[in-house]
Amino acid sequence: MPIFVWFLGKVVVMAKKRVLFISQEIVPYLPESEMANIGRFLPQGIQDKGKEIRTFMPRYGCINERRNQLHEVIRLSGMNLIINDTDHPLIIKVASIQAARMQVYFIDNEDYFQRKHTISDEEGNFFPDNDERSIFFARGVFETVRKLRWAPDLIYCQGWFTALVPLYLKKEYHDDPVFSKTKV
């Protein structure tokens, strides 16, 4: 919905600012933590201030699809991303946080995200392919937003799993019309 502003004696139509919120954890999909709570309530606060928002996180194997009502978005899924010379199918799922009237998009891939833990095993050892998982997640978000044809004004990154997003924006996607005016 456009915003109407009175400027110099005229009514000016201003588009809503678009914020792409990328997080490695969001409540209620993962257990409560400081990061997961921020991932849940910050996008809602941004949306409540009149901004248009899209929220993304990885679809970890510990997320219960039935309880959280995740479903695949066929029109966005189906492409392959090449990571380390190997094709990996990109699957996009979506769920809603009803209380916030907010959708969350999930980046999924069987090789990278079907484990029962998020970034480390039960002994606390980081997965050796977390670098590839982070690359897949960052590229998956960019490719999905391109398919949505939704040009964000701002990208907000939360968690080290999103750390490659600013680099990808600067080096790979800066000439893409969807991202040419996007700030991080």
PLM features: residue spans?
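Hydrophobic anchor at the start of a short beta-strand
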Residues: K51-I53, V104, P152, V184
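A conserved catalytic-core segment of Leloir-type glycosyltransferases
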Residues: T55, R59-K147
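A short, glycine/small-residue-rich beta-strand->loop->alpha-helix junction that serves as a flexible
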Residues: E25-I38, N64-R66
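A structural signal for isolated positions on well-ordered beta-strands in alpha/beta enzyme cores
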Residues: L20, R54, L154-Y156
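Nucleotide-activated donor-dependent transferases that construct or modify glycoconjugates
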Residues: A15-E32, M57-R59
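Conserved nucleotide-sugar donor-interacting segment of glycosyltransferase catalytic cores
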Residues: D131-V184
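A short, Lys/Arg-enriched amphipathic alpha-helix followed by its capping loop at the start of a domain
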Residues: F41-K51
